[in-house]
């Protein structure tokens, strides 16, 4: 569908296209879900056509803000004052043809962290891109259920906190 719609860009003149882009989906989207397409391809196709990108799922449903202790420590060692979520937002915001990065915020702390991250945005360096690619590869080595904590499964009739169980 994506390629078909882009093939009609000359006729339809898209103002922007919304894509899912984060440091896991950049090169590993199919490993997360076989129906997905790598964000690197999606973004490159938009750049070819000079179409701005609106980014959704920069935190991969919140998973990139809840890394395991080992992965979190690797990012914190590099930038101790920044949140783990800020790495994902910086990754998404670094690309020049990104119009905006969407962020689902629940708490005031999320908004404050986003403001610190984007005002002003400090783009990721090549070294940081490499670290995030390594983080993505390591994440995929851990057996997980791809739960994005949407809570559609809640409330559980048996009183179980299903998203919390799947997280661990």
Where is each model-derived feature located?
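Beta/alpha (TIM)-barrel catalytic core signal, keyed to glycine-rich beta->alpha loops juxtaposed to Asp/Glu
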Residues: 1-160, 164
């Amino acid at each position: 569908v994506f390629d078909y719609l882009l093939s009609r860009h000359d006729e339809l003149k898209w103002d922007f296209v919304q894509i899912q882009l984060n440091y896991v989906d950049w090169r590993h989207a199919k490993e997360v879900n076989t129906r997905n397409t790598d964000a690197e391809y999606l973004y490159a196709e938009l750049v070819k056509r000079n179409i701005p990108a609106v980014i959704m799922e920069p935190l991969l449903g919140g998973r990139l803000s809840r890394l395991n202790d080992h992965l979190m420590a690797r990012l914190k060692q590099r930038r101790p004052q920044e949140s783990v979520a800020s790495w994902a937002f910086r990754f998404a915001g670094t690309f020049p043809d990104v119009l905006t990065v969407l962020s689902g915020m629940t708490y005031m702390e999320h908004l404050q962290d986003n403001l610190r991250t984007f005002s002003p945005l400090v783009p990721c360096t090549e070294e940081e891109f490499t670290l995030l690619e390594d983080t993505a590869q390591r994440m995929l080595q851990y057996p997980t259920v791809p739960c994005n904590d949407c809570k559609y499964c809640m409330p559980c009739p048996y009183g179980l906190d299903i998203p919390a169980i799947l997280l661990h």
